[in-house]
Curated annotation (Swiss-Prot):
It comes from Bordetella avium (strain 197N). One of its GO terms (cellular component) is cytosol. Binds 1 Mg(2+) ion per subunit. One of its GO terms (biological process) is DNA repair. The active site is at D23 (nucleophile), K64 (schiff-base intermediate with substrate). It catalyses: phosphonoacetaldehyde + H2O = acetaldehyde + phosphate + H(+). Transmembrane segments: none annotated. Belongs to the HAD-like hydrolase superfamily. PhnX family. This is Phosphonoacetaldehyde hydrolase. NCBIfam families: HAD-SF-IA-v3, phosphonatase.
Amino acid sequence: MPFFFSGYAMNALPVRLEAVIFDWAGTLVDFGSFAPTRVFVEAFAQFGVALTLEQARGPMGMGKWDHIRALCDDPGIASQYQERFGALPDDAAVTAIYERFLPMQLEKVAEYSDVIPGALQTLREIRERGLKVGSCSGYPASVMRRVLERALAGGLEIATVVASDQVPRARPAPAMALKNAVELGVADVAACVKVDDTGVGIEEGRRAGMWSVGLLLSGNAAGLTRDAYQALDEVGREAARARARQAFASAEPHYFIDTIADLPSVLSDIEARLASAERP
């Protein structure tokens, strides 16, 4: 006989969604995810290392120390550092860059934290469906406090927020997504959806056993400002989608959408699949 707990039989599959867990930059706020990329470029420049925006975007979604470590492992970046300092960048060098990066990020993050169009309406629809809402970010908690202040001023509020320095291992490990599930009181991770604009964020959701949705045009993968996005014709948008899909290929999201405004129809499709006994 199955054992019942919180409305679920222990050997039963979920038949409806319970929660949606969002990334922040490039997903809910900061169209194009420019706040971290530009500050990475500026922080490395202070050590005599030239970074392009494209290079800075590469490891996006990771915790910021890990992001800097990944950048320093790039041969071209490492060789610049070695030429300047006479040695390859070790963990102490990464920490030094991070300590330069963090106050710069704290100072500038609010400038890039405007709410992405469609986010408020989508969150309202999600809550009207009776679903819980959580979130997580590659930002540390100190930076997230600034982001949340700006988001609240724009009418966006999410109570459950997990920062990268609040778990033992951040993305692509599943800890932040799973911490959300625990704090939200979710009974089955298969009844959760993770929405993100980075490959490691999508992988985080998959490793957590959740449905994963990749954002093609509002975030890091496309790297478009809101004005640039709006100026694209359909041919240009399809080209940007193709580039983003390629960037997400190894992460294998269950769904692709352009921006958060397109999420409600995906949630309806996932609920239909759950009702048919599918799992992520």
